[in-house]
Amino acid sequence: MKSVLPSTPIVTLKPKIEDSFAITFAPLSLEEIHALADDSANGAVVVMSGMVRNQTDGKPVVSLEYQAYEPMALRVFYQIAADIRSAWPAVNRVVIHHRIGRLQVGQISVLVAIGCPHRSEAFAACRYAIDTLKHNAPIWKKEHWQDGSSTWVSIGACEQSGQNC
């Protein structure tokens, strides 16, 4: 999927103090992410939870292994937040947390949460955040197959293949 925003120059803004970005080996918590996105001015908090599924194109998956270039990935997260605030100025909170390491089927790999006064902007901003993260962040995954083999998946592979990953 292509970005919903026109191409914009790189913004060197510091994220708002209320925002939260992380690359971590620790398990991710829906409740914690929701709380980080919550604000008394919000009418909506939209959370997107990405998880390890049990197959890719019908081929059984047993686990995924994520690696990231953390400093650059965090800069991409900051840029996503800046883009969101430019397109949807009412957004109060942007939360993006991604796991690294080996994850089993059913485990959460990424959580994105957007806090905003109105649901339509929150949904649009959350969709933009996850789509842009998957396309731009230097985070790689290795699919471990049931037959014992494994395959690395490159950044933006979902968009290049035209599939919904």
From Swiss-Prot:
BP terms from Gene Ontology: Mo-molybdopterin cofactor biosynthetic process
GO molecular-function terms, A-Z: molybdopterin synthase activity
Pathway: Cofactor biosynthesis; molybdopterin biosynthesis
Its EC number(s): 2.8.1.12
Enzyme kind, highest EC tier: transferase
Superkingdom of the organism of origin: Bacteria
Residues the record lists as binding substrate: M51, V52, R53, H118, R119, K134, K141, K142, E143
Keyword terms, alphabetized: Molybdenum cofactor biosynthesis, Transferase
Catalytic activity as recorded in UniProt: 2 [molybdopterin-synthase sulfur-carrier protein]-C-terminal-Gly-aminoethanethioate + cyclic pyranopterin phosphate + H2O = molybdopterin + 2 [molybdopterin-synthase sulfur-carrier protein]-C-terminal Gly-Gly + 2 H(+)
Pfam families: MoaE
Subunit structure and binding partners: Heterotetramer of 2 MoaD subunits and 2 MoaE subunits. Also stable as homodimer. The enzyme changes between these two forms during catalysis.
Family per record: Belongs to the MoaE family.
PANTHER family: MOLYBDOPTERIN SYNTHASE RELATED
Record's function text: Converts molybdopterin precursor Z into molybdopterin. This requires the incorporation of two sulfur atoms into precursor Z to generate a dithiolene group. The sulfur is provided by MoaD.
Protein name: Molybdopterin synthase catalytic subunit
Organism: Nostoc sp. (strain PCC 7120 / SAG 25.82 / UTEX 2576)
Gene it is expressed from: moaE
